[in-house]
């Protein structure tokens, strides 16, 4: 067994052990599709800088369960290969199967398209960056993948030439769902997308249902597009229409330089801090109830905060339930945050998958998107 094959097998073991990989056919795809081929120009490691094929640690890095940054612009990541466990979860959630036509928004390295093609799907991947699209297409050819094509284009518009699609996979953080994707989707089709929510991009499952009523004079427009939570996540944000804001959106995340010094106002609620997944469950719930919620750096990382109007203060919610606060209205924000945390705990600490929202048109009127309006527990 080659080094790469052994590392692939080890990655598969990790994904299956952690519960992100349950399908046998997808397990075979991860065990056979060579991720290193899709990283021919290397990736940016936090520890070792740019790692290229042949460098010490390159293959080991390729087969860690990590997202790998593949392109920087002014020092900012603009393209990557997503975390394998997240890829597996999204592919399983989408229910990708042989014979399906898949529209992928955001080509990345082409690895995700290769995995779906290995399941027998016909994948059309669209990326707005010509160099990213070209490299992904080259990698797919090198890997011998015949069931996927990569096109240069505005993801907002989808790709009519391959429609209708059974599924839409979105691999870039968006603020809403393009009407073009819905128009190019078969009846009963599904979309899985990371949609902006409270400073994060949790993965949502989007579907349509027959309208509960027909719109009549004096009635609001019918709503038949729904979203449900899948898991917490962070993705690089899309620009243009797919990144447009809307009046009831959460505030943008704040920079470390803008955030005032925090002081503890309420001590820990739980003896053991929530793990990453459960903390994102809490964060999602807080954001569903309070539009002041976003992300901000504190305590060595980025976490959930209620942001005040100055964007330099408010309340931060820690994984152990403690509340930190800063600013002129620190006490008020801390009290509000504590009430929200207790509400979530009293409801049994609901996970992201318990939330559902109707989608309504928002964003740029010239290029609208469907965005969540109000979230409810189901």
Q: Where are the language model's segments positioned?
A:
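Generic alpha-helical structural signal
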Residues: 9, 134-137, 338
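Class I SAM-binding transferase module
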Residues: 169, 174-295, 370
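Solvent-exposed amphipathic alpha-helical surface segments
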Residues: 18, 143, 344-348
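Short, functionally important structural connectors and interaction interfaces within domains
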Residues: 13, 55, 60, 78, ...
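Conserved nucleotide-cofactor-binding alpha/beta core module
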Residues: 82-192, 196-200, 204
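Class I SAM-dependent transferase core
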Residues: 2-103, 119, 132, 146, ...
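Intrinsically disordered, low-complexity terminal regions of plant proteins
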Residues: 244, 248-351, 355-378
